[in-house]
Amino acid sequence: MSQGKIVQIIGAVVDVEFQRNEVPKVYHALKVEGTAITLEVQQQLGDGVVRTIALGSTDGLKRNLLATNTERAISVPVGAGTLGRIMDVLGRPIDEAGDVQASDHWEIHRAAPSYEDQSSSTELLETGIKVIDLMCPFAKGGKVGLFGGAGVGKTVNMMELINNIAKAHSGLSVFAGVGERTREGNDFYHEMKDSNVLDKVAMVYGQMNEPPGNRLRVALTGLTMAEYFRDEKDENGKGKDVLLFVDNIYRYTLAGTEVSALLGRMPSAVGYQPTLAEEMGVLQERITSTKSGSITSIQAVYVPADDLTDPSPATTFAHLDSTVTLSRNIASLGIYPAVDPLDSTSRQMDPLVIGHEHYDTAQRVQQTLQKYKELKDIIAILGMDELSEEDKQSVSRARKIERFFSQPFHVAEVFTGSPGKYVSLKDTIRGFKAICDGEYDHLPEQAFYMVGSIEEAVEKANKMSAKA
């Protein structure tokens, strides 16, 4: 193993000089002697000097310290030993529960599965959240993005999906916390512990307070652990079905921007790194399903200033099967989850995949909401009285649909005081079809707010009329 010495330190960037015939390769990990710091080689500058990014604080580093080349990329523990544990970007435990007992270590930089090994699935994944199941259904083994600005409920939606899918799903889950709040990571750990599914979840965190190198690589660490579960075959030659949760993919891009600037690259549009599309592709192309096992990934995507055309969310869109767009306007009406049914999409929205009844109901709901959206300007200027009877009926049904899309969440029980509701896909389709058919035109729209199935709305309406 070759050794070099540190010649320059600028923030998180460390230059190390080696003998010219022993220069480490790009992405090789270097260990700094006498410290716990790992450096990752990013560039070869010539004359034996390599430029590296520190994975950890550079406090206490000084020139002439020795750095040893490990001659391989960062390797992290994989396998059953990671379940129930919280680890950092290097796979070191941060939950004070002793060492991670792993039989194997995998490098975090890996090639994506070849085209012939990949498989696509059209099997639906039921989430129990009405608006998602109806308007932008998820595919098993697909990629889902939760898009939203600050404070519209990305993390709460993700926690509810974890609650509904990970608990019902008998397989394994990996949670990668990329540049998010430490408190949320802590809440997630206790949530999993209280619901007795901690032994099926591996958690990897590189939170907001950590250097950019950690935040850039932690998504790859979590993905590597998920890939192991997918690819490790049992006695029947089958891998596992894994759920991968990433919160937040925007922070991965942001860390890439910071690293790019530190390395002195020219910025591109809006100050992002010139390699934005490639960096996103390197991560997303590996999140895929193969013939032996599947990775279903749910990623939260922060939208800066609510601008979906920003290069970061715009680049992410291309890689996803379903997009769930959270809207500030809907949140301001008090409708949660604040999913915009007209802006959310899914590749599964095809009658041959989801069935004609589901497809037709979703289309009718969309048409009713679109008509209401177009009539809003007229209503604002002239009022409801100027509308035709048919338009009044459409507006009334659209407002009921909007309210029926709201739903109490299990993870928000502590705040709202109302118990969470899981609504099956069959009940969801039946409820919305009945509203579109006008079966509930006689009920007040308030009855549809924050209920589960359509029967609960009828029951709520009866209670309201009894009180009146």
UniProtKB/Swiss-Prot annotation:
InterPro entries: AAA+_ATPase (IPR003593), ATP-synt_VA_C (IPR055190), ATP_synth_F1_bsu (IPR005722), ATPase_a/bsu_AS (IPR020003), ATPase_alpha/beta_chains (IPR050053), ATPase_F1/V1/A1_a/bsu_N (IPR004100), ATPase_F1/V1/A1_a/bsu_N_sf (IPR036121), ATPase_F1/V1/A1_a/bsu_nucl-bd (IPR000194)
Superkingdom of origin organism: Bacteria
Binding-site residues, ATP: 148-155
Membrane topology listed for this record: Peripheral membrane protein
GO CC term, one of those recorded: plasma membrane
Catalytic activity, reaction form: ATP + H2O + 4 H(+)(in) = ADP + phosphate + 5 H(+)(out)
Alphabetical list of CDD domains matching this protein: ATP-synt_F1_beta_C, ATP-synt_F1_beta_N, F1-ATPase_beta_CD
Subunit text: F-type ATPases have 2 components, CF(1) - the catalytic core - and CF(0) - the membrane proton channel. CF(1) has five subunits: alpha(3), beta(3), gamma(1), delta(1), epsilon(1). CF(0) has three main subunits: a(1), b(2) and c(9-12). The alpha and beta chains form an alternating ring which encloses part of the gamma chain. CF(1) is attached to CF(0) by a central stalk formed by the gamma and epsilon chains, while a peripheral stalk is formed by the delta and b chains.
Enzyme Commission number(s) of this protein: 7.1.2.2
Principal location: membrane
Transmembrane region(s): none
Name assigned to this protein: ATP synthase subunit beta
Keywords annotated in UniProt: ATP synthesis, ATP-binding, Cell inner membrane, Cell membrane, CF(1), Hydrogen ion transport, Ion transport, Membrane, Nucleotide-binding, Translocase, Transport
Role description: Produces ATP from ADP in the presence of a proton gradient across the membrane. The catalytic sites are hosted primarily by the beta subunits.
